[in-house]
């Protein structure tokens, strides 16, 4: 029986693809070597320990229907669209070796006519007249008996959108998380006009087979045709949840301030695991009582626009005469944290 396994996803859903990756990684025999090829539609993928409010322009993502997906590996934030090809190599130890998977991808690029080289710990670069340009970034995860290396190849990604979603709003965030380094990147289509996802997948597959000296049939998977993966439904539910994608953010603080016709407002939030652990409100309003009450209500609240609005509007029962002020405050807060 072959020790190789090849899976190719027909789904563009990042939560589906990352859930498949997680299930296979947890359940594969330690003797198996797996290649999983996939791609995502319009998604910002962040590292396991990153803060989405710090890394991403979450407001623009919401406006443009761009998803957020937190992966289980470390590293920085990246934007995925259908101009990217994603790969995951998995193996049990001691077989797992990220230098092997890196060489497989480099051999695949070479077979396509692109001379690339590894740079640093995570990147593949090509040399251009303007200097080195990144065409691939990677991240890694290891447990006691297995490991995986996953990464992205830029084929024809919309690099302007990449900059849009990875340059955050100028929010006053004093975060304990790490801000990603924005790398100089280029698309493979600049070097190989017309190159397709299918061609890249075929080249990586052939390099994978050549390295191990055997071949297997590809398993084509999609939400309608999932492989036999115990606990997949639970893994997908977690991968697609707000609690995982946003709530796992490192602790951070957020300062909001605005001047309204009825007075200035300054809000200080401390946020842990997506919940407000402390809220302070400062104002020169002639009637500060609703704002003081709001500070109490926001303690323990999810750091989410709709939940902040809900808590603010709940104060209308106790402060009906301040309806105009509370609705202005509600709309402003919701816009500021998106």
UniProtKB/Swiss-Prot annotation:
Binding residues for ATP: 71, 76-79, 134
EC number(s) per entry: 6.3.1.20
Keyword terms: ATP-binding, Cytoplasm, Ligase, Nucleotide-binding
Pfam families cross-referenced by the UniProt entry: Lip_prot_lig_C, LplA-B_cat
Alphabetized GO MF terms: ATP binding; lipoate-protein ligase activity; lipoyltransferase activity
Pathway participation: Protein modification; protein lipoylation via exogenous pathway; protein N(6)-(lipoyl)lysine from lipoate: step 1/2; Protein modification; protein lipoylation via exogenous pathway; protein N(6)-(lipoyl)lysine from lipoate: step 2/2
Compartments (UniProt record): Cytoplasm
All copies of domain BPL/LPL catalytic, residue ranges: 29-216
Role according to the record: Catalyzes both the ATP-dependent activation of exogenously supplied lipoate to lipoyl-AMP and the transfer of the activated lipoyl onto the lipoyl domains of lipoate-dependent enzymes.
Subunit note: Monomer.
Note: In the transfer reaction, the free carboxyl group of lipoic acid is attached via an amide linkage to the epsilon-amino group of a specific lysine residue of lipoyl domains of lipoate-dependent enzymes.
Family named by the database record: Belongs to the LplA family.
Protein name: Lipoate-protein ligase A
Species for this entry: Escherichia fergusonii (strain ATCC 35469 / DSM 13698 / CCUG 18766 / IAM 14443 / JCM 21226 / LMG 7866 / NBRC 102419 / NCTC 12128 / CDC 0568-73)
């Amino acid at each position: 029986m072959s020790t190789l396994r090849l899976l190719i996803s027909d789904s563009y859903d990042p939560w589906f693809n990352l859930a498949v990756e997680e299930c296979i990684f947890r359940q594969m025999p330690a003797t198996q070597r797996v290649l999983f090829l996939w791609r995502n539609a319009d998604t910002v993928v962040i590292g396991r320990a990153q803060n989405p409010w710090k890394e991403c322009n979450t407001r623009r993502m919401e406006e443009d229907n761009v998803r957020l997906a937190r992966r289980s590996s470390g590293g920085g934030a990246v934007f995925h669209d259908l101009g990217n090809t994603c790969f995951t190599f998995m193996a049990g130890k001691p077989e797992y070796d990220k230098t092997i998977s890196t060489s497989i991808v480099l051999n695949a690029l070479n077979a396509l006519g692109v001379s690339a080289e590894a740079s640093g710990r995570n990147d593949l670069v090509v040399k251009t007249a303007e200097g080195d340009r990144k065409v691939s970034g990677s991240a890694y995860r290891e447990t006691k008996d297995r490991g995986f290396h996953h990464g992205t190849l830029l084929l024809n990604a919309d690099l302007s959108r990449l900059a849009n979603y990875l340059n955050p709003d100028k929010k006053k965030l004093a975060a304990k998380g790490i801000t990603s380094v924005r790398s100089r990147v280029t698309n493979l289509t600049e070097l190989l006009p017309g190159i397709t996802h299918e061609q890249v997948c075929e080249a990586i597959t052939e390099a994978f087979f050549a390295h191990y000296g055997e071949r297997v049939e590809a398993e084509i998977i999609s939400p309608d045709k999932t492989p036999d993966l115990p606990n997949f439904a639970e893994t997908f539910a977690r991968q697609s949840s707000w609690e995982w994608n946003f709530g796992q953010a490192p602790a951070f603080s957020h300062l909001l301030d605005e001047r309204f016709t009825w007075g200035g407002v300054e809000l200080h939030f401390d946020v842990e695991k997506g919940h407000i652990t402390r809220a302070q409100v400062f104002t020169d309003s002639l009637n500060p009582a609703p704002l003081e009450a709001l500070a109490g209500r926001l303690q323990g609240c999810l750091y989410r626009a709709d939940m902040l609005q809900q808590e603010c509007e709940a104060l209308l029962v106790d402060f009906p005469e301040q309806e105009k002020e509370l609705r202005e405050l509600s709309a402003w807060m919701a816009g500021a944290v998106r």
